[in-house]
Regions:
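Thiotemplate assembly-line natural product biosynthesis machinery
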Residues: 1-24, 77-82
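Residue-level recognition of oxygen-bearing side chains
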Residues: 6, 31, 68-71
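Generic structural marker for isolated residues within well-ordered, non-membrane alpha-helices
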Residues: 12, 29, 47
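Pre-signature/interface helix of ABC/ABC-like ATPase nucleotide-binding domains
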Residues: 24, 34, 61-64
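N-terminal helix-turn-helix DNA-binding core of bacterial DNA-binding proteins
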Residues: 29-36
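Two-component histidine kinase catalytic core, primarily the HATPase_c
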Residues: 42
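C-terminal structural segments of small proteins and small subunits
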Residues: 59-81
Length: 82
């Protein structure tokens, strides 16, 4: 099983690659919409990346409560345990 730090590193790399963000801006407390300016279309791309990484089907319900990078780490941990 991957640690939260390993998942955070993976998410950081994905966000930097997909959305040209600064790595230092991608912290567990960073809010996806407000701080990182990720919009609803970007979330679809992000869901696809999570699905690819976890091997689990990702639904909109999985992302309903995701507001921060830390929330995304928690979702990925849950999917990896499934």
């Amino acid at each position: 099983m991957q640690s939260d730090d390993e998942i955070l590193d993976r998410i950081r790399g994905t966000l930097v690659q997909l959305f040209q963000l600064e790595p230092a801006d991608v912290t567990p407390a960073a809010r996806l919409y407000e701080d990182l300016e990720i919009d609803s279309i970007d979330v679809v791309d992000l869901m696809d990346e999570v699905q690819r990484h976890t091997g689990q089907k990702v639904t909109p319900e999985d992302f309903r409560s995701v507001r921060t990078v830390g929330d995304l780490v928690a979702v990925m941990q849950r999917l990896l345990r499934a």
